[in-house]
Amino acid sequence: MKKIIFMGTPSYATCILKALVENENFKLVALFTQPDKAVGRKQILTPSDTKAFLSQNYPSIPIFTPSSLKDKNIIREIKDLNPDFIVVAAYGKILPKAILDLAPCVNLHASLLPKYRGASPIQSAILNKDEKSGVCTMLMEEGLDTGAILESLECDIKDKNSSEVFELLANLAAKIILSTLLNFDKITPKKQEESLATLCRKIKKEDGLINLQNARELYQKYLAFTPWPGVFLENGLKFLELELVDELKQNAKMGEILELEKESFLLACKQGVLRIKKLQESGKKALDGRTYLNGKRLKSEDSLC
């Protein structure tokens, strides 16, 4: 039975953690995750998704929430646990060489590397209109997502939002990690092709700001930034649900309401047309498109904003 230290934080990582802890070939000896965070208006101290899952279902397994992995005491703790593998998935911290040298460190990355190294591979794939994405297992080294690839699985992501793709890739990751660890000695690591490498940065709230220039670009942002940070106009109006109707139409005025439907409306961009199904003004409740227009006394051929 192989001893595993798992390092991960969000729900994506929990799916992988669950697969490992339930498999009879592995013994989870510890979880490392981010410290509890203050959440919401009341700033309630909340554990990470992985910590909540493990403490509720496997309370005897130790959980570590260090602020730094460079602490000598933390490195000693890991060494004393004597793991056969350290598995890392969306942990949120860089592993120092002192830890990388203790055991094979296998990272699960939510892209088909070397594309989209970094913090937002799923959102970046959607923004770039990729129809395929996937998950890789790789041997970790000191560079950012630069290690040799062990295995990969791909899936179709066309017209799926980030939340849906996260779920798809989490399920793939839960499968591939078992395969990689069980067949580790038989796998020949494959170096990444550096000339094909691309980087992606962490998503910020302001990335959700949109204009009505291009319907296709706005739609891809909507998919990429659902559920967070969402998409919103400069005046704070949020588009919560929308569909791409036409990406080429150019003979209407930007921002013009083209047609009212039962619970939605068609909105002209400078190029293309969107169906707005649900929207929300800052500080107010969400409304379907038709109800919102009725409340504002807006009709066909009026400007939304």
UniProtKB/Swiss-Prot annotation:
Residue intervals passing through the bilayer: none
EC top class, as a word: transferase
Gene3D superfamilies listed in its UniProt record: 3.40.50.12230
SUPFAM superfamilies for this protein: FMT C-terminal domain-like, Formyltransferase
GO cellular component entries: cytosol
Binding residues for (6S)-5,6,7,8-tetrahydrofolate: 111-114
Family according to the record: Belongs to the Fmt family.
Name under which the protein is recorded: Methionyl-tRNA formyltransferase
Organism, as annotated: Campylobacter jejuni subsp. jejuni serotype O:2 (strain ATCC 700819 / NCTC 11168)
Upper lineage: Bacteria, Pseudomonadati, Campylobacterota, Epsilonproteobacteria, Campylobacterales
